[in-house]
Amino acid sequence: MAQGTLYIVSAPSGAGKSSLIQALLKTQPLYDTQVSVSHTTRAPRPGEVHGEHYFFVNHDEFKTMIGREAFLEHAEVFGNYYGTSRETIEQVLATGVDVFLDIDWQGAQQIREKMPQARSIFILPPSKIELDRRLRGRGQDSEEVIAKRMAQAVAEMSHYAEYDYLIVNDDFDTALSDLKTIIRAERLRMSRQKQRHNALISKLLAD
């Protein structure tokens, strides 16, 4: 069976990364593509399901996993830990399923060091003006918060060149088509096609 591909997807807040991933998943069968489910120490929010949205664990369990190097990457955010389990990812990839990991540039660097075969995609907004408009979309944040989020977005975007692919999300449908094209091209790589069609190739080359 052909090994699945791990896709690292990063973008500044407001670039439409999560919406693009969710739209892509709706067009792909579950046995072909899945989104990574992270471990976290934060409490479940209403409607969240263990194993579907996150794997919810306590701080001691999480630290034990860190100690045995169970995570491809992990980070602390506002007092809670978040991490990507190496075992979980590898088990899914071994079934031939592609896995999408929605993560920032720092997490992406950690994962590339441990899984250099992963493919990485960065998504940019079409302009700062449009990014500002999207960041203001909720209409609930102060100017100070907007300015902070914009500064964080610029810092995130400065790492775009570290990725394999670049998508500019000006038109959503076009960006989604670009994302699908990347996935299709990766599935046609020689390494995956040789695994997938091994029996056919053997028969074709037999005397």
Swiss-Prot record:
InterPro entries: GK/Ca_channel_bsu, Guanylate_kin-like_dom, Guanylate_kinase, Guanylate_kinase_CS, P-loop_NTPase
Highest taxon of the lineage: Bacteria
Pfam families: Guanylate_kin
Catalytic activity: GMP + ATP = GDP + ADP
The keyword Repressor is annotated on this UniProt entry: no
Sequence ranges assigned to domain Guanylate kinase-like in this UniProt record: 4-184
Similarity-based family: Belongs to the guanylate kinase family.
Protein name per its UniProtKB record: Guanylate kinase
Taxonomy of the source species: Bacteria, Pseudomonadati, Pseudomonadota, Gammaproteobacteria, Enterobacterales
